[in-house]
Amino acid sequence: MFFLYTFANEKLALGTMIYHGSIKSILNKEHINEIMKKIVTLAVAAMTAMTVSAQQGEFKTYEGNGFTMHVYYSNDVMADASYIVETKDGLVTIEEPLFKSGVKEFDAYVDKLGKPVTARITDYHEGGTGANSIIQPEGMPKFMHEGVYDAMMKGFQKNFGDKMVDRPTGKAKEVKFGDTQKINGVSYLFVNGPKNDFPAAGILIGKTFYLSHWTPAKAHMNSLQLANRDAVAQALEGLKIAKSYNAKYYLGSHGGVATPDDLDFRIAYLSKIEQLLTENQDATSFVEALKQAYPSLPGEDGLAALAANLYK
């Protein structure tokens, strides 16, 4: 599963460096194309491996205040996670699966719950919502259908072929940051997330679950997640914002469910990176210091590339 985790970070981190404004200026067109090529290559390699021994997805449930959160771990090449918020009045799906095998499992599970789907939320990832209307953070519909994101999805379609669902065609309702949507009695607060993400969206669900692009995993971050030193500070700020909501669980479009302890680990990890950047004058010594600070932490293979970003 670590290969899937690594690939997921490669894919999701594309957005880290193409977010609006100053972040977008970090990369030139050639660099973006290089990253996209790498992402698609990794995806195809992962898909080839998965065809030999495909893993089925799995569901886990967590209790909120008056609702149940169903978490679907797709175990696909993206390591994507999807969610279902269940109340007595109906269901809300969040980040529906992208691949047909996952859509089949997810939809079958929804059918077994025996309640109507009253809303579908697409935060960071397009999925199998088809012609159904969706709810998205402000700016995300436009972002998904132009430029690099659109090209990335078309690249996935070309390489994955009929393993992927068709891209959604339903109408999108945009929610402004700071606004709360109440659906089936559960509140969904759309908030600004980290500036090094796209489009910097977080959703606080029922004051219990906080959804962001990826779960704060106990693993090294990589070169695509942190494009430069500014991104370190921006990611750290975003996690501190997430922590301020005092959620019981922290969700990610990649990675599933994490705890406040996991979040605290990632905050401490980024703080340590900031410290080591001031203490080490070159990339080699930085990598060695980070390894010593976190022995046996997954993701060491990507540290040289990460350091190259931070010392350029």
Report the location of each language-model feature.
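Conserved beta-strand hairpin/beta-sheet module of binuclear metal-dependent hydrolase folds
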Residues: E58-K112, A201-W214
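Accessory terminal helices/loops
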Residues: S244-Y249, G256-K312
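Metallo-beta-lactamase
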Residues: Q56-F59, E63, L98, G147-A268, K272
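Short, Lys/Arg-enriched N-terminal segments with co-localized hydrophobic residues
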Residues: L4-I35
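Active-site metal-binding motif and surrounding structural segment of the metallo-beta-lactamase
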Residues: D89-G90, K100-F143, N246
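Sec-dependent signal peptide recognition
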Residues: K37-A43
